[in-house]
From Swiss-Prot:
Organism: Lachnoclostridium phytofermentans (strain ATCC 700394 / DSM 18823 / ISDg)
Name the UniProt record assigns to this protein: Ribonuclease HII
Reactions it catalyzes: Endonucleolytic cleavage to 5'-phosphomonoester
This protein's encoding gene: rnhB
Annotated EC: 3.1.26.4
GO cellular-component term (any): cytoplasm
Biological role stated in the UniProt entry: Endonuclease that specifically degrades the RNA of RNA-DNA hybrids.
RNase H type-2 domain residues: 70-254
Amino acid sequence: MNIKISEITKELELVGEGGFFGVKDKYGTDEREGVKKLLFKYENRYEKLNAERARVRFLQEYELSYPDYRYICGIDEVGRGPLAGPVIACAVILPKDCEILYINDSKQLSEKKREALYDEIMEKAISVGIGSASHARIEEINILQATYEAMRGAINKLGVVPELLLNDAVTIPKVVIPQVPIIKGDAKSISIAAASIVAKVTRDRLMVEYDTVFPGYGFASNKGYGSADHIKALKELGPSPIHRASFIKNLTSC
């Protein structure tokens, strides 16, 4: 008598990835279409999982290429382009053997995935530092210098002193720690990718809060970026206290 497919499913769940091929060998000669589909589904799942692990190992190559350094810090920012709100920078130090599946440049991830990864990063990281520069500070010293200031602030808030900085494309002035700028680093380094996610989630949450304080501009959805609805509201309502004057000077006469 053939074992029920539901029982095979339970067995597959019980043994997990490590025992899959044993179960596959056990039922590989079963001619039932349902069994074939079940085994294919699980094998495909584990193949995708292994491919993801390989992708994450590739993201670890920069960190692993500096074996003499224990504390390697990835740095990234978010918020250089919006019409309103601060620029936020994040510095993240991960353990050398840290595996965070599905981590990527924050721009490539859904909000739901970013939120889940944020929690995992905060749990696994050796240290996380977050820095910011307000809309007023951006106006005072310009967006580039404000970004550098936010990055320095993030470094200073780390619980340990990093030995090496991996930066997304930039070299940060007034920092004595060795730096390695990496073009499109948030897609090439696990530490920078982690920093991009934490910075993005932090700023997005802040803009959602601002939406309740300054309603009408749609900050909860546009996060301060220049969407059509945001620009329309800006023209109708005038600027809020967190708008960047130099960024909106061509959009409003206020």
